[in-house]
């Protein structure tokens, strides 16, 4: 079975159109652990066209996942005589470096209201939630990922609960994300 995925150079953020190079990997897989790690892996052969040369750290790959077409950032690559393997993570994880909560205080808010406040510092990110629980949390000098998924008592998951689903630059934290 032929797999075709799109690769975007690190500086290309136009994900609405075709990427800079279509890849034809031997395999591409996504592994997600509920409220845990999300990883993708690709294995690409050394091909005559030189597609494998485009696989570089910080490039973005668009591939099909269990929850639709998703964007993943290449975090690590390794080359062998047979090909290139790469480890990727959801682009939402970019928020570790570019969505900082200097002093954010969702006070007596439900899940959706809290996520709206938490994602306000960087409009690239958004959140969805059906959680009706009313709670309060204070986030000072935290990145968005720490604030939502961190192990501290004040994290979104510890205050409001829920299950996490990453969907490109949107995070869904619902009572349940599965069936």
Region locations from a protein language model:
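Juxtamembrane "anchor/assembly" segments of surface/extracellular structural proteins
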Residues: 1-54, 89-95
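Short, acidic/charged, Gly/Pro-enriched secondary-structure junctions
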Residues: 2-13, 45-80, 105-124, 154, ...
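Short, surface-exposed beta-strand/loop "edge" segments at domain boundaries and coil↔beta transitions
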Residues: 12-17, 48-52, 68-71, 93-97, ...
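Well-ordered beta-strand positions in beta-sheet-rich domains
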Residues: 27, 71-73, 85
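Short, exposed beta-strand/loop patches in secreted or surface proteins that constitute
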Residues: 28-33, 74-78, 163-165
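A generic structural signal for beta-strand entry/edge sites
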Residues: 37-41, 81-85, 168-172
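Short, solvent-exposed secondary-structure boundary/capping segments
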Residues: 76-91
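Charged- and aromatic-enriched interaction segments used to assemble
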Residues: 89-179
């Amino acid at each position: 079975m032929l797999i075709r995925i799109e690769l975007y150079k690190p500086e290309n953020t136009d994900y609405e159109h075709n990427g800079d190079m279509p890849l034809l990997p031997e395999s591409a897989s996504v592994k997600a652990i509920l409220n845990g790690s999300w990883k993708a892996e690709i294995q690409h052969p050394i091909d005559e066209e030189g597609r494998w040369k485009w696989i570089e750290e910080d490039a973005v790959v668009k591939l099909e996942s269990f929850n639709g077409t998703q964007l993943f950032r290449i975090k690590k690559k390794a080359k062998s005589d047979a090909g290139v393997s790469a480890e990727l993570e959801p682009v939402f994880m970019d928020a570790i470096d570019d969505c900082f909560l200097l002093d954010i205080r969702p006070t007596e808010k439900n899940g959706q209201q809290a996520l709206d406040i938490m994602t306000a510092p960087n409009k690239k990110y958004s959140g969805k939630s059906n959680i009706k629980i009313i709670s309060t949390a204070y986030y000072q000098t935290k990145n968005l990922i720490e604030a939502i998924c961190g192990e501290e008592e004040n994290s979104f998951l510890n205050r409001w609960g829920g299950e996490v689903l990453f969907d490109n630059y949107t995070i869904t934290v619902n009572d349940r994300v599965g069936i």
